[in-house]
């Protein structure tokens, strides 16, 4: 993992972004690409996306720009690109619909917007598959259908339990 600008004892409280809206990938917990040229390109692309869509929500591997009907997940590191590829191609009635979107050479995913449920969840109130999603990252799409919205690392569990 690359070194970050984040102080060693920074209280994250569930956030992975040290400086909200920063375009420096080292200000994100796991930010930065191994290839330095891609890292610089990602930072400038992130700046353009922030100017266009506003401050993103930060995850471990991606910055998520939230629109009215869709979200765009931009990778903050190499793992973020892998996650985007998985979420763009995996199809299930239990997961948010997405499609691959390449922005300035980076694999992103454009995904239907999900109204996120507050965590912690009372898992007993939801279908069994919800237990397979890390941190219960679920919500309802615009049609009122329950879906997982951050599931790239849980795909193997979802396919086994079909």
For the regions a protein language model found, what residue spans apply to each?
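Short hydrophobic-acidic sequence motifs that mark active-site Asp/Glu residues
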Residues: 64, 71-73, 110, 139, ...
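Short, surface-exposed coil-to-beta transition loops
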Residues: 59-60, 104, 133-136
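Short secondary-structure junctions
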Residues: 47-57, 97-100
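Generic beta-strand structural signal
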Residues: 66, 102-103, 140
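ATP-binding glycine-rich loop module of kinase domains
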Residues: 51-90
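Catalytic activation segment of kinase domains across protein kinase-like and atypical kinase folds
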Residues: 131-162
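Conserved structural core of kinase catalytic domains
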Residues: 75-76, 87-125
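Juxta-kinase regulatory segment immediately upstream of eukaryotic protein kinase catalytic domains
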Residues: 2-53
């Amino acid at each position: 993992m690359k070194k970050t600008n984040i102080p060693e004892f920074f209280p994250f409280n569930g956030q992975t972004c040290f400086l909200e809206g920063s375009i420096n990938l080292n200000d994100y917990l796991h930010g930065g690409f191994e290839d330095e040229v891609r890292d610089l390109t990602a930072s400038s692309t992130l700046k353009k996306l922030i100017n266009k869509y506003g401050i993103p929500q930060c995850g471990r591997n991606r910055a998520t720009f939230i629109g009215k009907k869709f979200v765009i997940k931009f990778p903050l590191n190499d793992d973020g690109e892998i996650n985007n590829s998985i979420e763009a191609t995996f199809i299930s009635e239990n997961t948010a619909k997405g499609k691959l979107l390449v922005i300035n050479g980076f694999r992103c995913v454009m995904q239907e917007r999900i109204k996120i449920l507050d965590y912690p969840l009372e898992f007993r109130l939801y279908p069994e598959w919800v237990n397979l999603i890390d941190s219960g990252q679920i919500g309802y799409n615009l049609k009122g259908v329950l879906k997982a919205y951050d599931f790239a690392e849980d795909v193997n569990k979802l396919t086994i339990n079909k």
